[in-house]
């Protein structure tokens, strides 16, 4: 079956108590590059790696370390994706904007509009091949 809209996971956001430890781990253990920092580099609110990990500083977080904050999905047609998503029973909008959804099990998804042929190019990459 073919679906009219194509999308890919652009990032996964994870709440962490100690953002500096996680930055060091992803850099030093896995060789990942930080591509963006929100806030002062000495005390970042959040950082993004090349490859799609977003670390969100949340020092007071009471849940288990590494709690998923949200999935970020890049799509070729935002309006079509949102219409299809909201057609599912139990999908709710979130306060962040119309492109933020909460699924029935509590998972939050940020749906973003891709530019140009970004989706096609990303889906053409076979990281295992």
Tell me what each language-model feature is:
Residues 33-67, 101-119:
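Conserved short beta-strand elements that form part of the metal-binding/catalytic scaffold
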Residues 1-5, 8-17, 35, 46-49, 61-129:
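Vicinal oxygen chelate
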Residues 1-23, 66-73, 115-129:
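N-terminal beta-strand motif that seeds the catalytic metal site of vicinal oxygen chelate
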Residues 21-28, 42-46, 60, 67-69, ...:
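Generic alpha-helix signal with a bias toward terminal, lower-confidence helices
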Residues 2-7, 13-54:
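Core segments of cupin and vicinal oxygen chelate
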């Amino acid at each position: 079956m073919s679906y009219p809209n194509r999308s890919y996971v652009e990032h996964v956001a994870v709440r962490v108590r100690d953002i500096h430890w996680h930055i060091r781990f992803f850099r030093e253990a896995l060789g990942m590059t930080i591509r963006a920092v929100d806030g002062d580099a000495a005390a970042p609110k959040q950082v993004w790696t090349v490859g799609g990990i977003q670390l969100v500083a949340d020092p007071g977080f009471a849940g288990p370390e590494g709690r998923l904050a949200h999935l970020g999905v890049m799509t070729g047609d935002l309006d079509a994706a949102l219409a299809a998503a909201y057609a599912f029973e139990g999908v709710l909008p979130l306060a962040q904007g119309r492109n933020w959804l909460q699924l029935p099990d509590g998972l939050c998804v940020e749906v973003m509009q891709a530019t140009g042929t970004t989706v096609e190019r990303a889906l053409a990459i076979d990281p295992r091949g």
